[in-house]
Amino acid sequence: LTCVTSKSIFGITTENCPDGQNLCFKKWYYLNHRYSDITWGCAATCPKPTNVRETIHCCETDKCNE
C-alpha cells in the first residue's frame, strides 16, 4: 500500500507502508474557518479523533488519502 505523507505546491510525497499497516489516513484540525495542521500517513488501525475539531479519514487503496 502506498500512502501520501505530505503535499506542497511541488506535488505529493508518498511512502510504501510497512507490513501490518494496511490503511492510509488523513487527519486535519479545524481552526478559524480553515483547515490546518494536516497529517497524512500509514496506520494499522484508523486513528480516533482526540477532540471535536479534529477529522480523520481512513481508506485502503493507494494514495487514497491525498
UniProtKB/Swiss-Prot annotation:
InterPro entries: Snake_3FTx, Snake_toxin-like_sf, Snake_toxin_con_site, Toxin_cobra-type. Keywords: Disulfide bond, G-protein coupled receptor impairing toxin, Neurotoxin, Postsynaptic neurotoxin, Secreted, Toxin. It holds the Pfam family Toxin_cobra-type. Disulfide bonds join C3-C24, C17-C42, C46-C58, C59-C64. It is found in: Secreted. GO terms for cellular component: extracellular region. GO terms for molecular function: toxin activity. Expressed by the venom gland. Belongs to the three-finger toxin family. Short-chain subfamily. Aminergic toxin sub-subfamily. Selectively binds with high-affinity to the a2B-adrenoceptor subtype (ADRA2B). The toxin reversibly binds to ADRA2B, and its mode of inhibition is non-competitive. The toxin has also been described to bind with high affinity to all muscarinic receptor subtypes (Ki=23 nM (on CHRM1), Ki=44 nM (on CHRM2), Ki=3 nM (on CHRM3), Ki=5 nM (on CHRM4), and Ki=8 nM (on CHRM5)) but no other data support these affinity values. Negative results: does not affect most adrenoceptors (ADRA1A, ADRA1B, ADRA2A and ADRA2C) and muscarinic receptors. Does not affect beta-1 (ADRB1) and beta-2 (ADRB2) adrenoceptors. This is Muscarinic toxin alpha. It comes from Dendroaspis polylepis polylepis (Black mamba).
